[in-house]
């Protein structure tokens, strides 16, 4: 299939997905976590992936691309320690080391928060590319927490990805939005432009309830596969 489907809670999929990524990684690997709509658990998934990799001994940084609506710092409990942010680094107002926040509970995990006050247009392909290139020299994995949908921040996060987790709920509208994201991943990435190996895609189903599937209240795996033609 073009995408691997994981119908497990986010804390279980490390076994299935991160093992594959870790085994193949030689250079810094860029992982994007995205979704077609908000409220599906995307940022929680980003934090879980980053923490999982860091706890396995991989030096990992997770970047919040959601300019103006950041909450990755809240989930990781470092919101009071934010001094500089992603946009400050892109604009040359701070160095990467000044903006990075080291997780208090995991020495291998760092956070680069989004700006809460800047406009999304402050993100540029050139600026994001330079920051990712610099981080690649210091880290094993770069996890990009993308905004939902296809806004500028999301497109930039997707563009540089090596691996992508598309997070969705087992609802028709959410799954169809995910289909659109899979299309963007296959056609608008740096890998696609360079005719390189395609981004490795994972479709993560959150809020999956087997009892509700049996009662017909929720889409099942077969339904999702049919909608996405997987």
Label every PLM stretch briefly:
Residues 35, 64, 113-116, 168, ...:
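Flexible glycine-/small-residue-rich
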Residues 42, 46, 124, 128, ...:
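Short, conserved glycine- and acidic-residue-centered signature motifs
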Residues 3-37, 58, 98:
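Extreme N-terminal, non-catalytic leader segments
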Residues 30-93:
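Walker A/P-loop NTP-binding active-site region of P-loop NTPases
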Residues 136-137, 141, 147-230:
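Conserved catalytic-core segment of NTP-binding enzymes
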Residues 22, 65-137:
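P-loop/Walker-type NTP enzyme "switch/lid" segment
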């Amino acid at each position: 299939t073009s995408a691997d489907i994981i119908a497990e809670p986010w804390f279980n999929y490390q076994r299935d997905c991160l093992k594959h990524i870790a085994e193949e990684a030689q250079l810094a690997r860029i992982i994007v976590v995205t979704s077609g709509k908000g409220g599906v658990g995307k940022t929680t998934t980003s934090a879980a992936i980053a923490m999982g990799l860091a706890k396995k001994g991989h030096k990992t940084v997770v970047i919040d691309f959601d300019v103006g609506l950041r909450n990755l710092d809240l989930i990781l409990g470092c919101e009071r320690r934010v001094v500089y942010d992603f946009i400050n680094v892109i604009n040359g107002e701070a160095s990467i080391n000044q903006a990075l926040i080291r997780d208090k509970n995991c020495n291998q995990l760092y956070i680069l928060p989004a700006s809460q006050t800047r406009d999304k247009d402050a993100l540029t392909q050139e600026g994001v590319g330079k920051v990712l290139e610099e981080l690649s020299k210091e880290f094993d994995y770069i996890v990009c927490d993308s905004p939902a949908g296809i806004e500028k921040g999301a497109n930039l996060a997707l563009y540089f990805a090596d691996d992508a987790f598309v997070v969705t709920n087992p609802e028709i509208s959410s799954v169809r939005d995910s289909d659109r994201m899979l299309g963007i991943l296959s056609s608008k990435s740096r890998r696609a432009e360079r005719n390189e190996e395609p981004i490795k895609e994972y479709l993560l189903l959150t809020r999956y309830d087997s009892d509700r599937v049996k009662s017909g209240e929720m889409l099942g795996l077969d339904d999702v596969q049919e909608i996405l033609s997987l």
